[in-house]
């Protein structure tokens, strides 16, 4: 079951530059980590009960780098907190939604995550995130054989979906 908005993901060229805006507003970066499976460096900024996630590409061919090249910096995805990602994943599949992974994987902060393609959600890349499991910060999602969340966000335009 979905409980709240967990975070809003924003694609940026540089976390160090982008965080200045949020620091000027009195917010602070809680954590920074690399998620190799997605080819990004991630900074989490607390904002009330939710967070802002800054996504900086770590290679020129990463999905976030492609997103930035096509669309420029800006909102990448909306993440909803789930108390049971696997049950929500099954409910979405049963409802005909296009999820991006064969099963939920581990993302930033060790959270179990699943992504829903923008063509299934009116143009918004949705991420479902559960509680952290195992070693926090260790992301084990295999992006090589599955479509990545960044690729799907970029395809939102190709599918005629709004940004």
Feature locations, PLM:
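Amphipathic alpha-helical segments
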Residues: 14-29, 88, 94-95
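Vicinal oxygen chelate
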Residues: 4-13, 34, 43-53, 65-163
